[in-house]
Each structure stands twice: as C-alpha cells, then as structure tokens.
C-alpha cells in the first residue's frame, strides 16, 4: 500500500467515524451527556460505565477477529443483510474513543475525591 493509498484510507475512516458517532449519538442519548447510555446500562448491570464500553468494544473486536481468521468478510461499508467489515472497524474505533471518555471522566472523579 502506498502512502497516498494509506492516507486515503485514513481519511475515509476518519470521515465515516465522525459521521457515525454523531448519527448514533441520537440513538443513545437524549441530551448533552455523551456517556448516558453507558451510565444507564452500568446501573442496570452493577458495573462501571467503562466496563460497559469495554464490553461493547469487545463485541466488535470479536466480530473483526472472526472475519480475519475465517477470511469470510466483505471489505465494504455494507454487505447484504448487514454491516461490512469497514463498518465494524469504525464502530470499534468509536467505542475506543467512548471508552477513553469513560476513563477520562472516571479519572476526574477519582481526582476530585483525593483532593
């Protein structure tokens, strides 16, 4: 893969990640709290929001792992009947960011408790 091809792929993913993060935001939060979904599910399960985000991330990692190991995937955004492998990568990267946000918030809360 050339540098130009790599940069094009990176740009394609960054554009999709941003668009999908904003689109899915409306499905999982009713206001400004970007972590509302993780907090609510964490409350239901007796977990921390970061643990919920990690579980969601792992679902996508497992799906990507299976696709790579079996070679059974469509390298596109969509495939007949669902998401293509590119979409799963974008979702995983977005969940990494949301997990980082959970940990950032957690670190701030812990810092407040110790000061």
Predicted regions and their residues:
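Intrinsically disordered, low-complexity regulatory regions
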Residues: 1-115
């Amino acid at each position: 893969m050339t540098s130009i091809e790599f940069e094009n792929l990176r740009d394609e993913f960054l554009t999709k990640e941003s668009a999908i993060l904003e689109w899915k935001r409306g499905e999982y939060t009713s206001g400004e709290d970007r972590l509302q979904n993780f907090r609510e599910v964490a409350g239901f399960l007796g977990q921390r929001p970061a643990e919920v985000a990690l579980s969601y991330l792992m679902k996508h990692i497992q799906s990507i792992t299976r696709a790579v190991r079996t070679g059974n995937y469509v390298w596109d955004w969509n495939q007949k009947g669902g998401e293509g492998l590119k979409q799963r990568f974008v979702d995983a990267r977005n969940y990494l960011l949301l997990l980082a946000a959970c940990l950032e918030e957690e670190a701030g809360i812990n810092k407040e408790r110790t000061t």
